[in-house]
Amino acid sequence: NDWTTATGKQVHLSLCFNPSHLEFVNPVATGRVRARQDLMGDTKRTRSMAVLIHGDAAFIGEGVVQETLNLSRVPGYTVGGTLHIIVNNQIGFTTRPNEGRSSMYATSVAKMLPAPIFHVNGEDPEAVAQCVLLALEFRARYQLDVVIDMYGYRRLGHNESDEPTFTQPVLYRRIAERKSVREGYLEHLLKLGEVTRAEADQIATHRQTLLEQNLAEARSEPGTQLKFERSKKWKNYFGGPEPTEETATGVDKQKLAALLEAQTRLPDDFHPHPKIVRWLAARKKMAREEHALDWAAAESLAFATLALEGVRIRLSGEDSGRGTFSHRHAVLHDYENGQLYT
């Protein structure tokens, strides 16, 4: 969805599909942001960012949160900082905080990073807004994750069929007696003289009328099949029930030999490991058909031919540079000074 700001700037908002598996969407969302940054050449990480919304019990309880935080400053994964917003209901379904974690705060896991953590009262909309602005300024300046822990409460049950007073009767009696956030904020504005109750009621009535009109229109219109058009980045991706035609993927032998030979050349000032010297010599023999290709050489040629056609090649994870079985050596380390050569 594209949104025009008050200053006339366009902002594209993309919402990821969030599965019922809590927090699984985190690496998906940050991965999409990183892919977008790479495609745009946004090496400064200023043109797009990730906003992740969490629950308090899930943020401290799900391991994928820690894994995502751990990768936030790793060069191959960083997105220049993510804004984490925890909607802290102080309960996880029926589980109280002291039953679901050993730390005082749900945000304790974020202390593994040099990231600020803002605890803010969710019943104070202006304080929440100030926190968000401060968090965005920090992220823009320091390119680090920021966490906002917004304290609130769940007025109703976990879902439509949940009866919260079965397990938290005292808490939910107090919640039932408490004014809504809107009423509490309205009283604050009335004391400041910023608005009259009649004006506030008029705003609320107007918004409610608009919502009811939109709902009525949605219910009255016949169901239609939405037409989905892929953006230009996805135009060449297609699928369907029918098998695709067989595509010729072969490459000329001379071109393969030249690519394999090119992979054995190193800068004049690079000092390879003694065993790498022998490994490179074996590759040269393969290029000259003096030695049979092995699986690792075939893999490197597959990558090389794709790269030659302008296809981006990205390998990530432990040992992806050298290869788990010392077979790939896509990234070499200078034996004397440790400098990298890809």
Q: Which ranges hold each PLM region?
A:
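Short, hydrophobic/amphipathic alpha-helical packing segments
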Residues: V25, A29, V65, A129-L133, ...
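Generic beta-strand/beta-sheet core signal
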Residues: V51-H54, I60-E62, I85-N88, F118-N121, ...
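Conserved phosphate-handling catalytic cores of large alpha/beta enzymes
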Residues: G92-S103, K111-V147, Y151-G157, S161, ...
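Generic recognition of flexible, low-complexity loop/linker segments
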Residues: R34-G41, L71-R73, A106, L134-E137, ...
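Conserved thiamine diphosphate
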Residues: A6, Y105-C131, R178-E199
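Alpha-helical scaffold elements adjacent to nucleotide-binding pockets in ATP/GTP-utilizing enzyme cores
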Residues: V64-T68, V109, Q130-A135, H206
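Flexible, glycine-rich loop/tail regions that form catalytic "lids" or insertion modules at the edges
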Residues: L144-V146, G152-T342
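Cofactor-binding active-site loop characterized by glycine-rich and histidine/acidic residues
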Residues: N1-P114, F118, R328, L332-T342
